[in-house]
């Protein structure tokens, strides 16, 4: 006779074994119709799973985040069901959920184009309308192997090879289609009606390029039509803001096959890059950092000693010379430790703050590369602080303050903070990790920062604070990090002389604000839709004549603005002024100056903004002062 405790503390007693669905029905028919799954003593379960003893339970509906995750996972099974009906020879690989949706990897001889995708979606809709019941079955590993061998599902068999023989995999029956999963899943298919198949791409089995290339079908799914339409609308807006599209329109950069994942910066894009670099440099100087520069290529022995070789060698570009192995740096910390190690350090030298615009390379899979957002060559606004344990709180607090100040400059005020704790693969003992995690948690609490915890997501050498920016479309971008490291300084022989005249190992704080300059420019481009604030705009002013008679004065104005440090250009083409204004507005130039005979006579410029506002006429020096103030204050 299990006693069930609900989230509000109310209890219900059942005569026999019960289930989440029976409990929902006991509460009310409306809840039973909405029930997707449940939690029993904190564990996710299917709505049909038996509950045989006293338990604390919660009923999950599509309104819950976990409910949305479950229905998306069930949509992946629905996709598999439709594919097997349409293409019986297809072999199904994996179908997990992802942010906002799901995908399924399929081994299929037929190339899935737009027409095939529409056919699959149509069959999925037909299956949903039948509202069939999903039946769960727990079997032995051997029974599962026999089933999938009979069905010719070689990828499922390979997955089963990695499952412990004593486990009992879950099989979910979608009528004649059977899929294998931990679950939970929706009880009936009506919950999966608000979906859309989005695209098809290639994906190597298990992400290994030595394996067969499969076809990956992506989809999105939501609790109701309103949510689905809102998401599709956001995608439309995101497509308009795509930094790759805007980058081409504004002539910022390009990428090409001869250098995959590496950016060719054009003059306009490089101007933005240098302005970001200038801004970060001002901040590091204000916070008393020393700027340094370490080599890009270091001996393999150093990477082995630091621990990076064992963790990252597959993602490192390597080379050799004169019988020595080298690697291009994927990160900057070992180089900064070598600088710290030059000369004897005293406790009086600490904290020592070291910053670098570090050029890094990582051998990311080619399929994961995406414009500026995922590259192989990038520059980190990296810094490392060497300090004593007693200085950790003050130094981490200063880093937190610096991060928030920088993000505010760019207009980001919706920032999520997470504390990432020890991963399974790590260096250092548990006592050291306990101390490091507690130190970061203390700094966050002291600074009144609300934060969540990401178990197991820390770096291999220490826990970290992660800062995720949310843009105007509600998308999250993880950028800044503050990582505490008690391990690497000791591994690389860093030490200082303490007040007791003994040698001690410093604590190392790894800190980045933008993350990588390339990716942050991509984020800003999409956030601003290319309408950068004046201080970041590649061209800040365009000066245009109405007729050839004003050309000399246009040149005079441009030269005067340039001498004031303003990025100004002229447009002396023999085109109508309206045409010029439209063209430079599309190029997102912040200020458009028009000069006719009256302006020449008065020594003035007529000022318009890219928004179409007419600011009236200014003396040239007055306009220069006006825009300079905007640039200096970074408004």
Swiss-Prot record:
Protein's name according to its UniProt entry: Threonine--tRNA ligase
| Domain TGS positions | 1-61
Q: Give the function comment from the record.
A: Catalyzes the attachment of threonine to tRNA(Thr) in a two-step reaction: L-threonine is first activated by ATP to form Thr-AMP and then transferred to the acceptor end of tRNA(Thr). Also edits incorrectly charged L-seryl-tRNA(Thr).
What superkingdom does the record give? Bacteria
- EC number assigned by the record: 6.1.1.3
HAMAP family found in the cross-reference section? Thr_tRNA_synth
Tell me where it mainly resides: cytoplasm
What are the alphabetically sorted keywords of the record? Aminoacyl-tRNA synthetase, ATP-binding, Cytoplasm, Ligase, Metal-binding, Nucleotide-binding, Protein biosynthesis, RNA-binding, tRNA-binding, Zinc
Per UniProt, the enzyme's principal EC class comes to ligase
| Record field: catalytic activity | tRNA(Thr) + L-threonine + ATP = L-threonyl-tRNA(Thr) + AMP + diphosphate + H(+)
Q: What InterPro entries does the annotation carry?
A: aa-tRNA-synt_IIb, aa-tRNA-synth_II, aa-tRNA-synth_II/BPL/LPL, Anticodon-bd, Anticodon-bd_dom_sf, Beta-grasp_dom_sf, TGS, TGS-like
Q: Which residues does the annotated region (Catalytic) include? A: 242-533
The record's annotation in Pfam families points to: HGTP_anticodon (PF03129), TGS (PF02824), tRNA-synt_2b (PF00587), tRNA_SAD (PF07973)
The note on the cofactor says:
Binds 1 zinc ion per subunit.
